[in-house]
Amino acid sequence: MTAELLVNVTPSETRVAYIDGGILQEIHIEREARRGIVGNIYKGRVSRVLPGMQAAFVDIGLDKAAFLHASDIMPHTECVAGDEQKQFTVRDISELVRQGQDLMVQVVKDPLGTKGARLTTDITLPSRYLVFMPGASHVGVSQRIESESERERLKKVVAEYCDEQGGFIIRTAAEGVCEEDLASDAAYLKRVWTKVMERKKRPQTRYQMYGELALAQRVLRDFADAQLDRIRVDSRLTYESLLEFTAEYIPEMTSKLEHYSGHQPIFDLYDVENEIQRALERKVELKSGGYLIIDQTEAMTTVDINTGAFVGHRNLDDTIFNTNIEATQAIARQLRLRNLGGIIIIDFIDMNNEDHRRRVLHSLEQALSKDRVKTSINGFSPLGLVEMTRKRTRESVEHVLCNECPTCHGRGTVKTVETVCYEIMREIVRVHHAYDSDRFLVYASPAVAEALKGEESHALAEVEIFVGKQVKVQVEPLYNQEQFDVVMM
């Protein structure tokens, strides 16, 4: 199967789609006005310390102060208050930082909703093959490199470049890479870190000292270890920028870059626009006739599986099992496609067969193994729910593309026409008891006004008799279904 990246650029927005086997697997979106800040390094100032939460708020120049938990302050953290490194043994936040203290921090989670960015003092700088860890002294190897001999070879090579500046993590893409390329990567990361430290020493430097790559370059770097067949870009300027980037950092990718100039929009090649639209819907259809219902809330994401129209097996247990197996593949894809993170609760169709439960869990684990984002599955709970987590760093596709519904304010439901009609009648009675008026004028949405003049007209007539006043109904086209006004005349 072929795998490729499609890069679509429009003014102020860049989108990158990862296509595998002709199917959209991931979509990444970045807008100039809301560019993600994960990976950025800042010289911040502690604005508030909260011992009760074991956390501190840090001013890094954003609208909202960023959040730093005590567990994210690493033992090798450099306290800017005094430039010596301290080995912290006490985890009390009030003994780790103080209000007004300057601190070097890195963003690990973008601001989300009412929450500010989340920070760490465990700063890392990624490149194609390595991740540089300032202040560390060891070499780590990606768990996805399974060959023990290769792990030892890589550790031996990279260990030579560890010094007082820091240590390294060897990424999956480094498997089989020669010493020369690893040395080049290590030298590049150290140059970047040297520049960061030089900026930090300038008295006038506040806030950002290092910025992550732009979206197209960042995705290309992160997908460098994937078996990409080509990268198509519909912007000449971005294409030339990526040519320069790959020539310096990922030379073997340069030949795979193409400038797309076709008349058909680049995302129409694989029906990406419609796939994005479907990723915003609650319901996900399964080929068998079953379906998923995905609900994203601030606390967690829930996934409910239903057999729907699938009645393909005579044995009910087999029907349920096959639907759940199919659902595991769809769930893994939807988590990547929608970029859902945090706590995820999956409500599989109840299975009494323990072997079926074990095989469904295994299928889910296998499907999630393709995900580059860290996931953890806790298995079935006593209630039969599967609890798992997926590392959240950036906003979900829904949060990037959508706003809260102005009608329901995020509830997902609106009051029925009947409910609003009765609210209006109660409001008329309330106003009648509180104030003196000759008659009432009701402004309501078209649907509610029609109901008051139609099926609810008898009830409204009884209200008129009770208050002894005429009630006139007028349509207000701009009102949503829940909006109304009762005016005294």
Curated annotation (Swiss-Prot):
Its cofactor is Mg(2+). Disulfide bonds: none annotated. Binds 1 Mg(2+) ion per subunit. GO terms for cellular component: cytoplasm. Mg(2+) binds at residues 304, 347. InterPro entries: NA-bd_OB-fold, RNA-bd_AU-1/RNase_E/G, RNase_E/G, RNase_E_G_thioredoxin-like, S1_domain. Its EC number is 3.1.26.-. GO terms for molecular function: endonuclease activity; metal ion binding; RNA nuclease activity; rRNA binding; tRNA binding. Belongs to the RNase E/G family. RNase G subfamily. Homodimer, and possible higher multimers. This is Ribonuclease G. It comes from Salmonella typhimurium (strain SL1344). The lineage of its organism: Bacteria, Pseudomonadati, Pseudomonadota, Gammaproteobacteria, Enterobacterales.
